[in-house]
Amino acid sequence: MICGMTYYQICWYFLIYSFGGWALEVVYHAVACGKVINRGFLNGPVCPVYGFGVLSVFAMMNTFQGSGYQLNDSMIFLFGVILATAVELIAGWLLDVCFHARWWDYSNKPLNFHGYICLEFSLIWGVAILLVVKVFQSFVEHHTSAHAPSIVGWMVVAILYALYLDRKSVV
């Protein structure tokens, strides 16, 4: 276990929230720009930055709750703002340095930091994390725990390997 989550849960949550983030990005871009495009770094339907962002919040929450702290909605929102923004900053910088490309640019937004992050989206991430924790996660937990890890585990490994191969095609 890592931060209160099994490897099985970590893989499932990463895949589910990476896909959910990709879907959110595609819908947001379709509404904002009027056309549907794949907004992900990879060719497939995932945005790993969302998976890492959600997992970082779950890890922090589990660590705090394991120490006996009760987290209220304000604390969950704050964790979402800070951790998701940190993940977005690191991911944006790494993608820029490694591939000399930007998958997002907040330079035109007020209170941005080098275009990688901005206050507006940091607050949106806080609300999104609050929704994930309070609304979606119980559904995700129920449906992922209903399957035997040994059977579905191989599916998860296959999907993660496909993501690895997808990464190789982008690089």
Model-found features: residue ranges?
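Aromatic-rich, lipid-facing transmembrane alpha helices and their immediate juxtamembrane interface loops
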Residues: 1-171
